[in-house]
């Protein structure tokens, strides 16, 4: 616990973050969630797509009971890859109420349609549909699905190659087909949309190319995302039977990249005997083998730009639907890219999501859960641990640095000794101080605490401030290595709550196991009444004053003594 803890520093290797990477469930009760979007209107709402054709709102941690949009009557979700797949809000949604969806129709076609919000801001007008684009296809799979507005204010659309396995129509390489592409259109131009003049094939003079195409050579890029800070585009493309890949397009790109499918699958020749030539193709910045990882379908995510986990800043997060693995990806400093494992989510990752604040989430497709991505402070204190919030709070406030540095551990079940408790108490009193608040005397006050002892200054400061009278009077001793009891903790933390000179009221006999004549009787009753420590048993009520106090309970008591969560 000695020293002021530093925030988690940007890792020398992103893998250094793996012990702290955390998924915390923030919503449940969804049915096959496949995507989400925020409206960018300052409401803080997250709009979640359920594959059958429903959009639900998560607001302030609660799912609203009434859907924002229900178009199940229009959506075909019979195939496992069909359904309502994409949602994007117009950049001026706060003033114009326009949003766009991507879904599959009964005839297997892909539909891009515009809707408007209704009079109730939490409900869309389901009858306001205006179909903008219909893309026919022959198979139920490989539909792409993501919609997003780029930093240029234009709408980007991902489409799969049309399915059937192996791209039988060679749509990925066919510039006369809108399948197997990223498209870019202007929804504020002509009706139903305009083709931006700057699109790479809009003005090439070739009647056999489609002007809507922004990038091609894709198999099933059903998840892509823009980096909200840089404008860079990240495209995760699901592989056939060998490789899963992540592609990168810099914000300054004029478009027109050919990402290789079906000439290539990742960096491999799709047909090994073809001796394919990768010249002119844009190779992935990350890829992984299905057979080597147990993966089957890459799920693209987001570059983290939130504020709650600064060490994740600038890292692209992505995962695999089947294996549940989540990776980070970032430049390696030498012109290449570094990808590293962060966690196994333990569920089918159907999508990632980004809220208005830049925080990132992952969806559990099977169980219908939504999990927020974050970094916990200690590798050995999971979000499910009973004192997780208290331990996180005192670390972030600078009261503790943990019991081990690499990886950072808190050791919540380790019993607190009286030397460590001196640091806890004085930081509770003074805040996140790095050194004892008083200069210790040259001659020790306590016979059992030498000037060379690591906690000498802390224990002397505890004495100077009147927090302790030691563990014995003749000779005066502190017992620094003695394990802390619940009774002793009651004294220390009550004095943080009140003042070092605090004395408790006379005891009234609350506890069956506390004799009224015991030195600590008034202290434990006062600690219980102040909410610093609960009873250890009821019927009859017991306090267990001689039980040892571990570091988790010390964190709990410190938080309560400082007024509870959140800490001031």
Stretches with model-predicted labels:
Residues 376-388, 401-419, 426-458, 469-487, ...:
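Feature responds to low-complexity, polar/acidic, surface-exposed segments characteristic
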Residues 1-166, 223-226, 230-243, 294-336, ...:
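Acidic, Gly/Ser/Thr-rich repeat motifs that build Ca2+-stabilized beta-propeller blades
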Residues 52, 109, 169-179, 243, ...:
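A detector of repeated loop/turn-to-beta-strand junctions in beta-rich toroidal repeat architectures
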Residues 112-120, 171-187, 249-250:
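Beta-propeller blade signature
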Residues 2-22, 63, 121-125, 192-204, ...:
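Blade/loop signatures of beta-propeller domains
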Residues 19, 29-30, 80-81, 139-141, ...:
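Conserved loop/turn at the beginning of each blade in beta-propeller domains
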Residues 218, 336-356:
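Conserved blade-ending motifs and adjacent loop-strand segments that build the rim/top face
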């Amino acid at each position: 616990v000695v020293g002021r803890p530093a925030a988690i520093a940007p890792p020398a290797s992103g893998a250094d973050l793996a012990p702290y990477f955390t998924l915390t469930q923030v919503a449940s009760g969804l049915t096959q969630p496949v995507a989400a979007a925020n409206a960018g209107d300052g409401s803080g709402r997250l709009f979640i797509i359920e594959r059958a054709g429903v959009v639900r709102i998560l607001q302030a941690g609660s799912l609203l009971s009434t859907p924002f949009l229900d178009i199940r009557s229009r959506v075909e979700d019979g195939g496992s890859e069909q359904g309502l797949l994409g949602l994007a809000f117009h950049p001026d949604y706060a003033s114009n109420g326009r949003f766009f969806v991507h879904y599959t129709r009964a005839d297997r076609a892909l539909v891009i349609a515009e809707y408007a919000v209704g009079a109730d801001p939490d409900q869309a007008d389901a009858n306001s549909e205006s179909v903008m684009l219909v893309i026919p296809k022959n198979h139920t799979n490989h539909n792409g699905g993501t919609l997003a507005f780029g930093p240029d204010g234009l709408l980007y659309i991902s489409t799969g190659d049309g399915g059937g396995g192996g791209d039988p129509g060679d749509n990925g390489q066919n510039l006369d087909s809108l399948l197997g592409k990223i498209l870019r259109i202007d929804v504020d131009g002509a009706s139903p949309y305009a083709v931006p003049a700057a699109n790479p094939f809009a003005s090439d003079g070739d009647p056999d190319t489609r002007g809507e195409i922004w990038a091609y050579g894709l198999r099933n890029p059903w998840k892509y995302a823009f980096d909200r800070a840089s404008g860079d585009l990240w495209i995760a493309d699901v592989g056939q039977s060998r490789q899963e890949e992540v592609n990168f397009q810099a914000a300054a790109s004029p478009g027109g990249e050919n990402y290789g499918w079906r000439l290539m699958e990742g960096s491999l020749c799709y047909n090994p005997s073809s001796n394919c030539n990768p010249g002119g193709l844009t190779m992935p910045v990350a890829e992984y083998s299905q057979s080597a990882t147990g993966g089957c379908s890459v799920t693209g995510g987001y570059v983290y730009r939130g504020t709650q986990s600064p060490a994740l800043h600038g890292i692209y997060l992505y995962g695999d639907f089947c294996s549940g693995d989540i990776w980070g990806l970032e430049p390696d400093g030498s012109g290449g890219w570094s990808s590293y494992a962060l966690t196994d989510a333990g569920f089918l990752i159907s999508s990632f999501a980004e809220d208005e604040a830049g925080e990132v989430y992952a969806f559990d497709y099977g169980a219908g859960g939504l999990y927020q991505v974050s970094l916990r402070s200690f590798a050995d204190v999971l979000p499910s641990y009973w004192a997780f919030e208290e331990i996180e709070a005192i670390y972030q406030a600078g009261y503790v640095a943990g019991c081990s540095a690499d990886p950072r551990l808190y050791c919540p079940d380790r019993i607190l000794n009286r030397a460590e408790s001196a640091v806890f108490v004085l930081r509770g009193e003074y805040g996140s101080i790095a050194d004892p608040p008083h200069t210790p005397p040259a001659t020790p006050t306590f016979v059992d605490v030498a000037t060379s002892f690591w906690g000498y200054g802390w224990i002397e400061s505890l004495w100077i401030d009147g927090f302790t009278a030691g563990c014995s009077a003749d000779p005066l001793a502190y017992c620094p290595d003695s394990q802390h009891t619940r009774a002793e903790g009651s004294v220390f933390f009550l004095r943080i709550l009140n003042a070092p000179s605090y004395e408790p009221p006379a005891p009234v006999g609350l506890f069956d196991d506390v004799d009224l004549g015991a030195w600590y009787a008034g202290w434990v009753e006062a600690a219980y009444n102040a909410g610093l420590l609960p009873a250890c048993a009821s019927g009859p009520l017991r306090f267990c004053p001689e039980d040892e106090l571990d570091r988790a309970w010390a964190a709990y008591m410190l938080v309560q003594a400082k007024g509870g969560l959140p800490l001031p």
